[in-house]
Amino acid sequence: MTMTFMSSPSLLMTSESVTEGHPDKVCDQIADAILDEIIGHDPDAHVACEVTATTGLVVIMGEISTAHHVDYTGIARQVIRDVGYTKSEHGFSFESCGVVVSVKEQSREIAAAVGADEGAGDQGIMLGFACN
């Protein structure tokens, strides 16, 4: 009998859970707010938005095709303020952090591959394991 990933006797499944205010959560909230803003004005938009952050800096990037003008910096600062990062002496503040935006239109290839029945053409969750 061959052993599979799921039948391995030494299988250890782990996951990470972060709490409110963690940079991963803040970045997710910024991306969600950007999507909400766009879809609220342009339901036919195509959005692939990624957000990352470090001390004093937020970077918004991706491929977004929409007819709606988006104030990416304003949305990011509002989310950061709403989360509670309001004092620069704490290492991060909505007023003093840098916000870099690098967004371009979605590529024609991805846009052509995504139809009304399929909302995402290049998204997935990967699960793997190491072996010798």
Give short role names for the model-derived ranges.
Residues 2-132:
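A domain-level signal for the structural core that forms small-molecule/cofactor-binding pockets
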